Amino acid sequence: MATMAAEPVFVDTNVLVYAHVAEAPWHQEAQEAIADHEAAGAPLWISRQVLREYMVSLTRPQQFPIPPELTTVVAQVQQFQQRFHVANEGPEVTTRLLALLLEVPTRGRRIHDANIVATMLVYGVRRLLTNNTDDFVRFAAFIEVIPLVPPPASEPPPSA
């Protein structure tokens, strides 16, 4: 009997940062989520955009009380390129991004999110692991958003 391979998962920048910075919120959750998808055999994807955003986040002085050394960040990015499938942003991604912007009107910094979705679509990845679920709700017709931290259960209504 043949088994189906787990569907690929795209890892958003915030999850990558949380997983690799011990002081970050949701550090343990991010590490476990990545490990769980790996254990299930899901190919894990990132993009060149995610690599750039990771470097920006970790080297911004105001981000962490003691920012990591640049050599550490560079070494981590080199490791990510070995550990994850890395999607390149060629002309196909730009073409898909432009079409996506017309399908789901998006402006300003949200275009970065649209670019991630366009990259995913070009590479056939339909699942996104992120802690910024609200940023991707508008693209629900195209991708499945997997929340890093499930939303809290709604509180029961007060009794009368």
Label the predicted regions.
Residues 36-37, 80, 100, 104:
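Hydrophobic helix-cap positions at the C-terminus of alpha-helices
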Residues 1-4, 8, 114-160:
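Acidic, PIN/NYN-like endoribonuclease modules and their adjacent C-terminal/linker elements
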Residues 56-88:
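Helix-adjacent hinge/juxtasegments
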Residues 15, 50, 93, 115-116, ...:
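Alpha-helix capping/helix-boundary segments
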Residues 40-41, 80-83, 142:
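Structured helix-beta-strand junction loops
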Residues 1-46, 62-75, 138-139, 153-160:
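Short, well-structured N-terminal submotif of metal-dependent ribonuclease cores
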Residues 3, 85-131:
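Active-site neighborhoods of divalent-metal-dependent phosphate/nucleic-acid chemistry enzymes
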Residues 45-48, 130:
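Short beta-strand segments at enzyme active-site cores
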